[in-house]
Amino acid sequence: IPAAASEVVTSSQVAVQILRKYAPAGSRVFVVGGAGVEQALLDAGFIASRDPRDCVAVVQGFGPLVSWEDLAQASYLIQAGAIWIATNLDSTFPTQLGIAPGNGSFVAAVRNAVGREPDGVGGKPDRSMMDRAMAVVPAKAPLLVGDRYDTDVAAGIAAGITTMLVLSGVSTPADVWASKIRAGYLGESVQDLITEYIGPLESEDGYSCGEAKAMYLAAESVVRATGGTRLERLRAADSLKWSLVEHVGLDSFAEGQISLDLGE
C-alpha cells in the first residue's frame, strides 16, 4: 500500500495534539516510552524530558525499555498535579515469542498508583486518531484493519468507519465468538485485502460462506460450522451468531452458553 510519511498517523502524535489543550508549546513534559513519543513532543514544540524535575505533564507511551522507575516517576508527577496523557490502551503486545504486556498494562499500573484515569488517550479505542487519519489522507471510504476488538474495532465503530478484523495478531476465533461488538469483515491477515472477499449468505438452516456452512443446533447449544476453509467457517458462524442475538442475547455467546464448533 503506497503511503508517504506525511500520511502516517501515530498514537503519539495524537496524544501530543490532545496535550496542546492542556499545556502550551514550550512546556516541559516527562516522557515515558520510546523515541516516537519523544519525537512527537519535540515536533510540536514541547520540551521532552527524561528527567521529571519541573515537568508539568506526562505523556505515557509504549517502549520495550520502560522501567519501574519510569512508572514511579510518572505516578509522583501525576499525584502532584501534572497532566497525564496516554498514547494508547492496548493491554497486550504480540511478539514472535508470544503475547507481552502492552502500553495499556503499564497505564493500568500507574492508574492503580494514582487512583484516577488519564486526562486523555491518543490512540484507540478513542476516535481521535481515526479523525486525524481521515483528515490527513483525506479518506472518502475508509476501512480500518486491525487485530483487536477492544481497540481497533471499537475505535472504528466510534468513528463510524467500516472495520475488518484480522486473525494474524491478538484476536482468535474464540474472541470473534465472544465479542459484543461486530467487525464489518473478517480476514486471516491483511493479505485478504487483495483477494476476492467471499461473504456469508443466509440459507434455510443457517449461513453459508464459500464451501462452508454454519448451523445452530439448539439441543446442543452449539453453532457448528463445517466444510470450506477456517475463515469461511468463521464468517458463516459469525453471521449466524449475530442473527441469533435478538433471540438469545449477546451474553449467551460471551459467557459460553452457546458454543462454537469450527471443526478444528
Predicted regions and their residues:
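Asp-based, Mg2+/Mn2+-dependent phosphohydrolase catalytic module
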Residues: 1-9, 16-264
